[in-house]
């Protein structure tokens, strides 16, 4: 009956015996005939030894084939026994029906009603049935059975993945030598055993089967009480009688019976004719003689096989159904769009499973929840071999809940599903990329598109291979952030898109930052060089421009210094050029060179660089800023132009003159604490077109080249000359004494007093473990050396500021920090 029902269903967290019990109970409950004529009896020796399995699947198997597979895997033997068990009491052989008996210990089997059976001729005159034929049968079997099963949870524990069992049976001297060369090495499905001990037991099962099959006995006779699954004692056989008592007891393992009814001849003939018409041929039983030696017809004859009692009876290794590829749906708890464990495994439901087959487990197996399967591995196109998560490499593309997946079965075992692919379907078609049309309009596009959990946004890698318009895009819907490469277009609709540029584009509706510990080179120079791409930091043109910059700066600066201008300092510029030259030190292009200590940023272009902003542009250097132009340096301000220096300003024009004009407003030139010299190689002209030219000083002295002079102030006015004085005027007017008050500007005495602020570098932890960005350093001792040769000590307060350093002019300072006596 069980052969007639084929099913596909899932069992969770049950042992093989639990499942067999469940199936038999289902048959008995659903079928009134079987309920009264069929039952299951499990030998007490089995107990609860079988571990629970997370996942066992019946796949397109009959219930009978499925039960056989489960029992064979655990090495559990079975037979059918006439009669039904009486719950809590002995079996009722008189009851109409059969019992499926499961056992693994032959010593627990019942003794046959025949008890001791003689080896003797079987004649009608004999008072007891006897065995008339007896022979021992030996079959060469492997001397070792090995079992290997991959354990992906402990991949480095190879020694626990293989178990080997040597035969304890005796196959004779030559038989043992032959068996020693035979090793049944079987590679099973992964993770076959629940534990290492369980794997050893499964390996022992196969060896026990070979020991069982190595030696058996064939017999025949007329013993009507013989039955499979029961043992008897054989007597009267000379060879058997020579063995110890325990080796004269045998368990019947199979039986073939021919029985004839004692009907009258004319009725018997009609019965034979009826059997013939129904295809029931007696030829199958021709191996049995129709009469004994006296010529009398034999009414009953049996041919049987048996093994010595005590030999473990074990069925052969199961043949798994090896299902083809199957479709499944990824499942998970409610409100979880992605559900996995630390190994990236997911839960699945096979759509073919029926709810009515899983009511015993509360629907687990067909509930569309994470109870429908054990964790199932997901195959990846790339999986690394590193220990631990953070050092690992590989591709991680977990199927979300609801995804259709393609399932293969490791080792062909339905109990070992593996997801090998994810599938689109009518309800879940292939994704369209951001703002782009779907298939088939964008059939030239390929890539990856993710989806925000509990949202509609996503991230994507899009490769567009449209003829003549290839491009790549790495993008996130958050802030519209995109990196576009190649032939840039608007989103494709209907297979076409408007062009919007070529090259590369990084864009975002939020911030963009570039961080590089060695430096950044922004260059618009075209790289040349045949099939070579050119160096990453190719900068020959840039270095040439920097060299020209330094030469011009030094040449004009030195010339200015020779003509009373302030000298220029090009050391910082020269050091920067040197760092740019050594930029690649320690890299793969210059592995033997020393690595530069400080990162730099270079910006260069052959046709110009433009900076523009609707608000402020701030440029600052803790050292020098050198701005050099080979031709014109033009600074323009729509309103004020302020130029401030802490230690001198020098303006030098080698040619073309120096022009300073205040078109509207006052022109103010002051030397507040020192002299003012205005020199001209030719003429000096001071004019006041509409006002008064006023020269005010404590003493005014006008001196001509020939020695003539006019001195005003510090006493009476004095004129002097080696030449006669000459006056041109119509008259001389003399009046009372009179003077004017000179108006002098007031110059303040403010110095360059400063307080130093000491801060931690970003990332340096404080005493409490915090890592603030630029947190102040409290109570630090400072040794300060100034460029005027003076030195002092100071201490930072709770705000990180030092004591006030008072100086009349600005100076460069070298600072040493000490804390706790350490510098």
What are these regions (language model features)?
Residues 1-823:
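Amphipathic alpha-helical and helix-coil boundary elements used as assembly
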């Amino acid at each position: 009956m069980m052969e007639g029902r084929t099913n596909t269903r899932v069992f969770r967290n049950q042992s093989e015996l639990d499942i067999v019990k469940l199936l038999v109970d289902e048959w008995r409950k659903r079928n009134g005939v079987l309920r009264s004529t069929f039952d299951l009896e499990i030998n007490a020796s089995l107990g609860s030894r079988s571990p629970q399995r997370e996942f066992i699947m019946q796949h397109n198997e009959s219930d009978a084939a499925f039960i056989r597979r489960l029992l064979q895997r655990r090495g559990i033997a079975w037979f059918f026994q006439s009669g039904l068990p009486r719950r809590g009491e002995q079996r009722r052989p008189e009851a109409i029906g059969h019992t499926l008996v499961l056992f693994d210990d032959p010593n627990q089997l019942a003794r046959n009603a025949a008890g001791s059976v003689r080896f003797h001729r079987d004649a009608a005159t004999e008072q007891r049935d006897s065995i008339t034929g007896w022979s021992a049968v030996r079959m060469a079997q492997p001397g070792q059975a090995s079992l290997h099963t991959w354990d992906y949870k402990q991949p480095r524990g190879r020694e626990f993945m293989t178990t080997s069992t040597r035969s304890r049976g005796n196959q004779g001297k030559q038989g043992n030598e032959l068996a020693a060369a035979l090793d049944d090495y079987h590679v099973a499905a992964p993770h076959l055993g629940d534990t290492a001990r369980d794997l050893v037991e499964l390996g022992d099962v196969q060896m026990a089967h070979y020991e069982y099959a190595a030696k058996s006995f064939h017999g025949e006779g007329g013993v009507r009480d013989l039955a499979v699954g029961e043992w008897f004692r054989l007597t009267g056989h000379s060879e058997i009688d020579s063995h110890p008592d325990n080796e004269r007891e045998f368990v019947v393992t199979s039986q073939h019976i021919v029985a004839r009814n004692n009907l009258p001849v004319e009725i018997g003939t009609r019965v034979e004719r009826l059997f013939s018409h129904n295809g029931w041929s007696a030829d199958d039983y021709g191996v049995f003689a129709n009469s004994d030696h006296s010529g009398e017809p034999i009414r009953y004859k049996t041919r049987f096989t048996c093994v010595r009692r005590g030999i473990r009876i074990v069925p052969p290794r199961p043949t798994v159904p090896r299902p083809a590829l199957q479709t499944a749906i990824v499942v998970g708890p409610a409100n979880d769009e992605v559900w996995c464990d630390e190994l990236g495994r997911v839960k699945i439901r096979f759509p073919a499973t029926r709810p009515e087959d899983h009511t015993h487990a509360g629907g687990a197996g067909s509930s569309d929840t994470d109870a429908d399967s054990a964790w199932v591995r997901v195959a990846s196109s790339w999986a690394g071999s590193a220990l631990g998560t953070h050092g690992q490499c590989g591709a991680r593309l977990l199927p979300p809940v609801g995804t259709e997946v393609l399932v293969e079965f490791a080792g062909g075992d339905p109990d070992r599903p593996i997801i090998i692919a994810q599938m689109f379907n009518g309800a879940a078609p292939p994704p369209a990329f951001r703002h782009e049309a779907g298939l088939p309009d964008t059939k030239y596009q390929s890539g990856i598109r993710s989806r925000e959990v509990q949202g509609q946004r996503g991230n994507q890698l899009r490769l567009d291979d449209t003829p003549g318009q290839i491009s790549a895009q790495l993008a996130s819907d958050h802030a519209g952030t995109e990196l576009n490469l190649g032939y840039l277009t608007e989103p494709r609709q209907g297979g076409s898109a408007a062009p919007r540029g070529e090259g590369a584009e990084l864009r975002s509706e939020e911030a963009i930052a570039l961080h590089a510990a060695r430096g950044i080179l922004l260059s618009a120079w075209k790289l040349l060089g045949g099939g070579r791409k050119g160096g990453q930091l190719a900068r020959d043109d840039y270095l040439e421009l920097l060299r020209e910059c330094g030469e011009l700066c030094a040449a004009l600066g030195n010339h200015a210094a020779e003509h009373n201008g302030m000298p220029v300092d090009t050391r910082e510029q020269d050091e920067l050029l040197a760092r740019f030259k050594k930029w690649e030190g320690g890299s793969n292009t210059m592995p033997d060179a020393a690595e530069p200590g400080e990162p730099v940023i270079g910006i260069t272009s052959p046709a110009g660089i433009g900076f523009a902003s609707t608000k402020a542009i701030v440029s600052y250097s803790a050292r020098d800023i050198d701005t050099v132009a080979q031709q014109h340096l033009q600074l323009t301000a729509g309103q004020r132009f302020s130029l401030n220096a802490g230690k001198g300003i020098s303006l030098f024009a080698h040619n073309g003159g120096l022009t300073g004009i205040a078109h509207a407003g006052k022109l103010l030139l002051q030397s507040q604490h020192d002299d003012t010299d205005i020199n001209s190689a030719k003429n000096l002209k001071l004019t006041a077109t509409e006002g008064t030219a006023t020269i005010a000083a404590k003493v005014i002295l006008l001196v001509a080249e020939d020695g003539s002079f006019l001195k005003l102030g510090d006493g009476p006015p004095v004129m002097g000359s080696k030449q006669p004085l000459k006056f041109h005027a119509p008259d001389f007017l003399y009046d009372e004494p009179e003077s004017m008050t000179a108006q002098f500007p007031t110059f303040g005495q403010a110095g360059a007093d400063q307080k130093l602020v000491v801060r931690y570098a970003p990332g340096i932890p404080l005493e409490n473990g915090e890592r603030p960005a630029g947190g102040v350093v409290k109570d630090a001792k400072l040794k300060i050396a100034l460029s005027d040769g003076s030195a002092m000590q100071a201490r930072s307060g709770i705000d990180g500021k030092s004591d006030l350093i008072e100086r009349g002019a600005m100076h460069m300072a070298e600072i040493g920090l000490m804390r706790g006596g350490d510098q």
